[in-house]
Amino acid sequence: MPKELEKLILAISHLPGIWEKSATKLAFFLLNSNQNFNESLASSIKDIKSKVTYCKNCFSLCDLKQDFCEICKNDSRDSYTIAVVEEYLDLVIIEESWVFKWKYHILGWAISPINWVFIWDLRFKELFERIEKSDENVEIILATNPNIEWEATSSYIIEEIEKRKLKYKTKITKLSRWLSSWYIEYADNITLINALKERKEV
């Protein structure tokens, strides 16, 4: 096999969920694809790191020249309800339900000492600043996955909010039992909507 083809297969196999057999199929697909398609794909891959940035408010993704994402800029959204999620993909999945019109805060991970992810690695400071700046009561929805890491993360958020002398009440809610055995990424739309609609105050 040509070295460049082997190199491409190896690179593709590093993508999440792609094993060597699938990587080989994709490499041969690209080998037989139109050159314009390949160049466009290569350009998009190259630009993804240089032309996409993080929203300064919620840490969602936006175009490089923008300070805030489309959700944060949307005044029709409920600014006093903030869904805290682990990553951008969780936001996308919730948004695909077309039901909820609140705002978000992306922490970037969950507390996980075994993976060397600690409190200072996450965007807690920015979350608490958003709560403190609010001029009304706020609801914080812990839209998180049912695992040990997120139990620790949720507990930290709850404890920190309770310790602070906030001017307005902060209501903290968790997803209902509908999502007790499902990760947000894998939950079907109805299960996720029910889990969010029937969220419980902690």
Question: What are these regions, as identified by a protein language model?
Answer:
Residues M1-P16:
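Extended, structured, electrostatic nucleic-acid-contact surfaces
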Residues I48-K51, K65:
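Short metal-coordination and nucleic-acid-contact micro-motifs, chiefly zinc-binding Cys/His arrays
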Residues C55-C58, C69-C72:
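Short cysteine-rich clusters marking metal-coordination/redox-active sites
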Residues C62-L64, R77:
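Short functional micro-motifs and their immediate structural scaffolds
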Residues T81, V85-E86, N137-W150, I157:
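Acidic beta-strand-to-loop metal/phosphate-binding motif
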Residues I94-I114:
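Histidine/lysine/aspartate-rich catalytic loop segments that bind and position anionic ligands
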Residues K169-V202:
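Conserved phosphate-handling catalytic cores of large alpha/beta enzymes
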